[in-house]
Design a protein with these regions (language model features):
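A short helix-breaking turn/cap at a secondary-structure junction
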Residues: 24-28, 208-295, 312, 476-488
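Short glycine/serine-rich loop segments
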Residues: 122-246, 431-443, 447-452
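Residue-level signal for inorganic ion chemistry
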Residues: 56, 242, 272, 298, ...
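N-terminal secretory signal peptides and thylakoid transit peptides that target proteins
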Residues: 1-14
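Short, surface-exposed loop/helix-turn segments at secondary-structure junctions
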Residues: 402-423
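Acyltransferase
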Residues: 51-54, 83, 285-310, 333-344, ...
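Gly/Ser-rich catalytic/binding loops embedded in alpha/beta enzyme cores
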Residues: 11, 16, 26-194, 293-296, ...
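Short helix-loop capping/hinge segments that flank enzyme active sites or metal/cofactor-binding pockets
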Residues: 90-113, 266-275, 324-383, 395-399, ...
Length: 488
């Protein structure tokens, strides 16, 4: 027998199927509008891909001066793609690609002034997967330099601003994607995550952000080990849009069976581990309040929350992660030097990049090996905790989105690092573990800024997370919320 909600959803879809043509703007602004609705309208012939692209371009023009979320636009190429026949569940829908992914012939700055004029030589795995899905990328969304910081305030182009309050950060490193989706320019956008960079902008902008398992997505099948921290995904305004992106772009040759399209919640009662404190201690009081509210919601949904103590030496694990992060920054600086054919200076790279790179460059082979071993031990303990519960729940961040400048790359590095560690107090371990994690917008700060809660499962457990996310979304819907900067 159909549940009442399922019956109403089916009735709504049937009514939609019988409706006459709508303007493309309706597919962006109507209640509940998202990528899934746009895809249905395309399939039914009630709207064209060209109309969706033109509408998204117009919406970008309305808000980008206030948000600074897209610096490179490829409108003519998008129009040409929209005119071509494209097949697939997300084909023909507009999106943006983060400026850390390499797209052939398009700007490839990685947020660095040194690469201000560089263009991509080829499509990397993420860009190739986006193209193969039939999605139409309108342009490049902003990112901090090399994706190193949890805010998008590069000296190349200036800060990207939060649609809920433009004086505040949109997060990072997928801050441009987060701002564009939250402001209603497109329903979902490419994002990537090496330490929280999908989940952080999702939390800052009131969005859904799924970090997939290591090796899950097309082009990432060979990634292995705790140092392979980066994955690709999206930020979106609805769970079903995130599920659709995953189904369309996941690998069929990865280490886990394909998830496929997850369409709704499970009836299963889950054991949920609760960890409110991060490696830096207790979060901001507004974050703690949202966390407690989410705990109550889980109980009402029939789940079984249990306290989950920290199973590993968090300070040692974070220090090891920072050493590996620094080694990556050092490689980025070496790449800049090869590109410039000279040593980069202060006009090329930001102070924080040099500082991270200096930390990495100082590591000898033995020290780096010790960092890897420390992180492997932490990951082993982290994964073992899932013997005691099905899902782990934490905040996404230690505080609400800060004001622009609080995490600026020009700050004294000791001050910046102290602030970063207090802010990014929950998300890096999932990258080292290769575990999937989803951020959901479950509350607001006293100042009206979004606060996200994170749910994590063992590697390969995306279906479990999406089913739980559907149930939470139905119980506490966020679709009607609109930020101060909205593209209509």
């Amino acid at each position: 027998m159909l549940e009442r909600r399922q019956f109403l959803e089916m009735a709504a879809l049937a009514a939609l199927a019988q409706a006459g043509p709508l303007s493309a703007a309706d597919e962006f602004d109507a209640p509940g509008s998202d990528a899934a609705r746009q895809a249905l309208a395309l399939k039914q012939g009630r709207v064209t891909s060209a109309a969706l692209v033109e509408t998204a371009l117009a919406r970008l023009e309305r808000v980008n001066d206030r948000l600074n979320a897209c610096r490179f636009l490829y409108a003519d190429a998008a129009r040409a793609q929209a005119a071509a026949k494209r097949t697939g569940p997300v084909a023909g829908l507009p999106t943006f690609t983060k400026d850390l992914a390499e797209e052939k012939g398009r700007a490839f700055t990685e947020g660095a002034r040194a690469f201000a004029t560089r263009t991509g030589a080829t499509d990397d795995g993420a860009a190739a997967a986006i193209a193969a899905s039939g999605l139409i990328s309108l342009g490049r969304s902003t990112t901090p330099e090399f994706g190193l910081l949890p805010t998008t305030e590069p000296l190349l182009g200036g800060p990207t601003r939060n649609p809920w309050n433009p004086a505040h950060s949109s997060g990072g490193s997928s801050g441009g994607a987060g701002a564009l989706v939250a402001a209603g320019v497109v329903p979902f956008a490419h994002a990537s995550d090496g330490g929280g960079s999908i989940r952080i902008p999702a939390s800052c902008n009131g969005l859904v952000g799924l970090k997939p398992s290591r090796g899950r997505m097309a082009g990432e099948e060979g990634d292995k080990g705790v140092t392979a921290v980066g994955v690709n995904g999206c930020v979106s305004r609805s769970v079903r849009d995130t599920a659709a992106w995953l189904a369309a772009l996941e690998s069929r040759k990865g280490p886990y069976p394909p998830v496929g399209l997850v369409t709704g919640p499970s009836r299963r009662s889950l054991r949920v581990g609760l960890r409110g404190a991060g490696h830096a201690g207790e979060p901001h009081s507004d974050v703690r309040a949202v966390f407690e509210s989410a705990t109550d919601l889980l109980k009402r949904l029939g789940h079984r929350p249990v306290e989950a103590p920290m199973p590993y030496d968090a300070p040692a694990a974070i220090d090891a992660f920072l050493n590996i992060w620094g080694a990556g920054a050092a490689r980025s600086v070496q790449g800049v030097q090869a590109w410039l054919k000279r040593a980069p200076g202060s006009d090329d790279l930001e102070p924080s990049t040099f500082a991270f790179a200096e930390r990495g460059a100082k590591l000898g082979e033995a020290q780096l090996g010790k960092a890897v071993a420390t992180l492997e031990g932490a990951v082993s303990a982290y994964l073992a905790q899932f013997d005691s519960f099905d899902v782990l729940m934490t905040p996404v961040l230690g505080a609400p989105p800060p004001e622009i400048g609080w995490l600026a790359p020009t700050l004294d590095f000791d001050t910046l690092l102290e602030r970063v560690l207090a802010y990014v107090a929950y998300t890096p371990i999932e990258n080292a573990a290769g575990a999937p994690a989803i951020a959901l917008p479950l509350g607001m700060s006293a100042k009206g800024l979004p606060i996200g809660i994170q749910f994590t499962a063992p590697p390969g457990g995306e279906r479990r997370l999406l089913e739980l996310a559907y149930a939470i979304e139905r119980a506490r819907p966020w679709h009607g919320l609109r930020p101060d900067v909205w593209a209509a």
